[in-house]
Structures are given as structure tokens and as C-alpha cells.
């Protein structure tokens, strides 16, 4: 717990916590840590036992679209650290498979694969574990960044396209695809592709997304088939 500065606070309101700069920590890392400590959704996630604030993003999407329900089959691409898996299973989903390059602690009753989704062996394995075609494919995949904004953005868009292609290939009729994206940039092509196969494609920005972030989610519903 971070203690408030001596002398109390202004008008009874807690001041944002500040961290002493640690050896080897860059200014950007310092800013990220302070933002995490002071972020209400991060604090709420810790208090409720969710592995990340992203759990609240997917919960807001589900509040609107009601994807998570008993009997639904769900695939979670880029599932680490497991917040989306936690929210889905908490809301009644029992048939769910997640995949990530990083290790993910178990989330019962989900199946979790530590694999590269782009490995040709991965999609068949996921479908085998799921026991059939999914009702929902959700993607929070993120690439390794190189620090060059345009290059990093193109890599993100590339992963959205890979996730969308997979969803179009495997979804049940009437199914849905949800993917993290960013406003602007090169997403027009993937949105056009989704509109060919889904009855509705929208941008959705949850309240749990930071207001200063360009993060949005693509939500495609009513899969019409290949």
C-alpha cells in the first residue's frame, strides 16, 4: 500500500501516488508503473482477483452483446494473463480454449495452450479441444514491439487480420468476432473484410480503456458464413 504524503491531502482527496525512481528504470517505465498504481480499474482488478484490468473491458463488451452464456463455445487468442478467460468462465462459459506464447496460470474449466497461434498446428488443436465450431472468437493478441510507431501499428493490424481470417474460417453461423484495435491507421481493409461476412461491424470503446488511449475494440456480429 502506498502511503499518502505527510500532511494529509488536499480537501480530503488522495493525491496520485509517486514512485521513487529505481536504478535501471526508464522514465517511460516509471510513468507506466505510476499509472498502474493510480488507475482505478487496475486497483479494482487486484481487489477482485482478476489478472488484469482487461477483464473489465471484455465484461463491458459482454454486457452489451451477451456473448458469454452457458453452452457457448469460445476461443481466446492472446489470452495471457487470463483476465478474459476469467470473465468468460465466471459468466457461465464452460467450453473455452485460450492460446498464448506466454505461460498462463490455469483458469478452470478453460483449456490453455502455450503455443504460437500462427503455427499451423495450433488452430486444429484448439478446435479439437473445443469440441466443435466456436460461437465467439476474441483476440487480444499483441506483437513484440520495436519502438517504431508505424511498424508496431502494422504488426498489430497484421495480427487482427490473422484473427479475423481464422474467425471467418471457423465460426458458427450467427457467431461473433471481437478484437483489440487502435483508432486510425490501417484497419480499413480488415473492417471491409469483416463487413463482407458479418451483418454488423462496429468500434466499441469500453470505459475501462484509458481515455488518453486510442485503443478500441472491433466487434463483428451476425456471422453470415464464408
Swiss-Prot record:
Residues of the active site: 180 (proton acceptor)
Keywords of the record: Cytoplasm, Methyltransferase, rRNA processing, S-adenosyl-L-methionine, Transferase
EC number, as in UniProt: 2.1.1.166
Gene Ontology molecular functions: rRNA (uridine-2'-O-)-methyltransferase activity
Transmembrane portions of the chain: none
Purpose: Specifically methylates the uridine in position 2552 of 23S rRNA at the 2'-O position of the ribose in the fully assembled 50S ribosomal subunit.
Protein name: Ribosomal RNA large subunit methyltransferase E
Taxonomic source organism: Caulobacter sp. (strain K31)
